[in-house]
């Protein structure tokens, strides 16, 4: 019978991980020593015997590489055990299988029997006094429900233990073929040194070893190791993102910490409101670097960030991207799109007059921070927002500001946001809220609001940005291929035609692409493709396979191809 003790398992896994890391360090040193002998210069060590010895140690380098791969697999497996226990909600559990399968089963049967006997005895008593005082026997339904629920929990716990045990053993077995290969491969290396008294490195036959059947399997083993390590790396990254997103959702009060976490998570993995808040923090930091900011302005910027990023659904981003849900959350009935736009426009105009025209430094900076962030998030979308932190963009602003004697002149807001459209925001004065053409920014917000009546549906052909949450824009591969193969082609960036897909449909296309990438590069993630070697036929077939995986209808495909083939060319 199994006994599951989480503390002991985690403690032993941690101990073994440290031992493997120490062993890995020793293997790296051993590999370095082997390589030093294998790379000896002919001027110091030459001749047929010397060549055999150097080849012998050169092949030992390959063996140590195999050991290092195996050790890495062991380390990532042991390091992932705590996450598996956490997912199973068994991080601090102590469970004896015999207790679940015997003691609790007996207790369940005995409890049912006792209750049945008590109910029967009570019924006999009530029958005896029925002519004097008729009473109904008590119901045992609640007891039965709770007893059944407890037994169901017992069975699920047994299943959970068995599944966890089986999953861990199955994954651990992933390394067995590596171990068997290393043992057989090393044995063949030793045999290739000769027999009897002649079994020395000086008689080593590199050809016999390298052309052996077992050594020819080295490529398959290396591919297996790389695939396993890649999957585990992706799992660890997904878990890190999940934990960081939870931290953001729980609340991070420090803007710098919020921005740091947002960048680690990746803007493409954040909710629209989180992206918007991160964008605005970037904006505030860059404005701070471009000129003097008073304390009133800093406070206003902080409140402006809060107005957009707070948990309640009141931000303009939420209002425009999902007006129905927003109004519902605020306790209002969903209204007609035209009336929705009129209402938003009136609110923008009112806030502009109150906070910009008739406001002070605090209210103006608050209004500008909110407005710029709202427009920026709408234009850049979630994936492009990370480009805001480019050093060259911030540098251009700072340099221009310093050349003007710390007066901001001839500086454009688009310099701060490299992928923005041309806002034509005027720049003059020496504090952020004064360098913005507020009237034009107000119009930008209203223009943004006007898009609220357009609903994007799956398989619609749309621009790559902005995103259309909860749908995802499938960028495809034709744009990157065309940049390398079509003369004078220039990518349209955020305006590149894409197909709107559900998350499940988009994941299906990614799976097809990763399989193709693996065939091309041996890697499902991070492989570098030589796009010039990819033929038009191959890119067309890949595109169609991705569309097939997402069940994109023929009409939508044709619309996508028509839109994509309207190339932009360099002059």
UniProtKB/Swiss-Prot annotation:
Residues 5-39, 141-192 form a coiled coil. Pfam families: LXG (PF04740), Tox-SHH (PF15652). Its main location: secreted. GO terms for cellular component: extracellular region. InterPro entries: Bact_secretion_toxin, LXG_dom, Tox-SHH_dom. PROSITE patterns: LXG (PS51756). Induction: Expressed on rich and minimal solid media likely in early stationary phase; not dependent on DegSU. Not expressed in liquid LB, but only under conditions that promote biofilm formation. Probably interacts with cognate immunity protein YokJ but not with non-cognate immunity proteins. The interaction inhibits the toxic activity of YokJ. PANTHER family: RIBONUCLEASE YQCG-RELATED, TYPE VII SECRETION SYSTEM PROTEIN ESSD. This is Toxin YokI.
């Amino acid at each position: 019978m199994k006994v599951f003790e989480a503390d002991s398992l985690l403690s032993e896994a941690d101990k073994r991980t440290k031992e493997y890391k120490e062993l890995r360090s020793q293997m790296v040193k051993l590999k370095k020593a082997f390589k030093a002998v294998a790379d000896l210069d002919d001027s110091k060590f030459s001749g047929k015997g010397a060549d055999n010895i150097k080849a012998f140690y050169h092949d030992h380098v390959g063996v140590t590489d195999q050991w290092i791969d195996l050790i890495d697999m062991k380390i990532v497996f042991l390091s992932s055990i705590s996450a598996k226990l956490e997912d199973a909600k068994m991080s601090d559990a102590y469970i004896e299988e015999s207790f679940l399968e015997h003691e609790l089963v007996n207790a369940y049967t005995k409890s049912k029997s006792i209750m049945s006997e008590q109910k029967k005895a009570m019924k006999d008593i009530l029958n005896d006094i029925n002519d004097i005082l008729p009473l109904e026997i008590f119901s045992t339904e609640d007891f039965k429900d709770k007893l059944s629920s407890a037994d169901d929990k017992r069975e699920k716990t047994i299943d959970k233990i068995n599944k966890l045990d089986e999953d861990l053993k199955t994954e651990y077995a992933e390394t067995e073929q590596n171990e068997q290969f290393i043992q057989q491969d090393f044995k063949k290396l030793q045999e290739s040194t000769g027999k009897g008294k002649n079994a020395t490195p000086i008689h080593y036959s590199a050809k016999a070893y390298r052309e052996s059947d077992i050594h020819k399997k080295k490529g398959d083993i290396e591919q297996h190791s790389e695939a396993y390590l890649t999957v585990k790396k992706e799992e660890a990254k997904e878990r890190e993102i999940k934990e960081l997103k939870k931290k953001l959702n729980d609340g991070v009060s420090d803007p710098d910490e919020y921005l740091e976490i947002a960048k680690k998570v990746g803007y493409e993995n954040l909710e629209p409101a989180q992206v918007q808040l991160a964008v605005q923090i970037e904006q505030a930091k860059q404005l701070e670097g471009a000129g003097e900011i008073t304390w009133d302005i800093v406070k206003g910027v902080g409140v402006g960030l809060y107005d957009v990023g707070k948990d309640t659904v009141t931000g303009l981003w939420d209002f425009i991207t999902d007006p129905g849900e927003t109004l519902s959350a605020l306790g209002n009935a969903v209204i007609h799109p035209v009336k929705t736009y009129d209402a938003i426009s009136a609110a923008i105009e009112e806030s502009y007059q109150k906070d910009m025209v008739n406001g002070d430094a605090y209210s103006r900076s608050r209004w500008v921070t909110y407005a710029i962030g709202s427009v920026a998030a709408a234009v850049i979308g979630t994936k492009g927002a990370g480009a805001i932190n480019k050093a060259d963009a911030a540098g251009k602003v700072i340099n221009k500001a310093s050349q003007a004697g710390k007066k901001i002149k001839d500086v454009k807001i688009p310099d701060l946001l490299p992928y923005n459209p041309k806002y034509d925001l005027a720049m003059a004065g020496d504090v952020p809220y004064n360098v913005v053409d507020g009237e034009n920014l107000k119009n930008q917000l209203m223009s943004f609001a006007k898009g609220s009546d357009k609903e994007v549906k799956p398989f619609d052909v749309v621009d790559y940005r902005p995103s259309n949450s909860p749908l995802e824009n499938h960028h495809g591969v034709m744009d990157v291929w065309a940049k390398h193969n079509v003369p004078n082609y220039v990518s349209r960036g955020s305006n590149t035609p894409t197909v709107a897909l559900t998350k499940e449909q988009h994941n299906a296309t990614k799976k097809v692409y990763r399989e193709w990438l693996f065939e091309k590069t041996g890697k499902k993630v991070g492989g570098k493709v030589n796009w010039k070697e990819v033929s038009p036929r191959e890119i067309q077939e890949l595109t169609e396979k991705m569309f097939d995986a997402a069940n994109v209808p023929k009409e939508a495909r044709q619309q996508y191809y028509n839109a994509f083939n309207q190339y932009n060319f360099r002059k």
